[in-house]
Amino acid sequence: MYTEQYNQLNRQRVDWQTEEEVRLGWLTILQNTLAITFHAERGRSDADYNQVIIEFKNVGLFHGNQNSAKFQEALEELSRYIPAKAGIEGLDVRHYQGIAIDGESIAFVHISSENGQPIPGPIMPLSPDSVQMVFEACRQSCRRAVTATNLIEDFGHGSVAGGNLMQA
């Protein structure tokens, strides 16, 4: 379903040398394909969209190993960002999904609502299936928390709806 996006990411990753290039490559394709806007580096998370939080690392630093230092760092960061965002938005952490991406591999992470510990899924290589899983997680995250910030973004004077209302 997202074969073209996988092909674009696979072509681009050959040239990626920094975490920033991984982040820009992924976010550009996600936003253009799904017509959504990620919040980049808010609250120190690399990117978030509704209840999906993505943590990027430099190319290949997971080494396909859940015990690698950079994968453990990504887990630790997601285990801070997800509860923080859940607290701000007033939702349970189980509604949030973390995704760790190092340009060559992808892992999904949930936070246990019992003990707050990260529960990682397997580290998957970049493939049409793993890319589709990321796109579907983002596409299906359509529930926005009712917060002042979200209401201003959706209906304030800088939004499409707000602009249309002011011109009516």
Go through the PLM ranges and name each one.
Residues 1-97, 105-166:
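A short, conserved, highly charged catalytic patch centered on acidic carboxylates
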